[in-house]
Amino acid sequence: MEKAKIHHIPFKLSGPAIEKNTKLTFKAEDKNGIWNIEDIKGKKVISLFPAINTKICDMQTQQIAKLAQEHKNVTFISISTDSVKKQEEWCAAKGLENVLIVSDDKYKEFQTKTNAYIPRINKLTRGFILLDKENIIQEISLNIELSKEPNYTLLDKWIK
């Protein structure tokens, strides 16, 4: 997938999306500073989204928080290009303390390595990436239409 749409308006991604069976390593930033995917052990789900203060991104991140409660054997990571401050404010406003949310704004490694990035608007696309304990991509699902929620049923099937 090299294109995404927002309300049917096409946008080019930064390149061809990363593929299954690829090792994904990256650093990002969280409220404590530098955050590294390699510090997280076990199976992981990365939930990527464009902007936390929008309706669909809000719903997606809250749904991920629910899934994290149901699937304790999986680490759920939410990532966007929002600033850490904006992410923290959102979490505080929603009362969500169990959400692992990181920012790709400073280091830009996630967007560079996955190409799940829309340069024209400086936002990530929407979707999920499932990693095994070695950080090898097992499944990937990126939305073509960003104004729609991702496929939670597919994600739930993957992690069972």
Identify what each model region corresponds to.
Residues 1-160:
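Chalcogenol-based redox active-site neighborhoods
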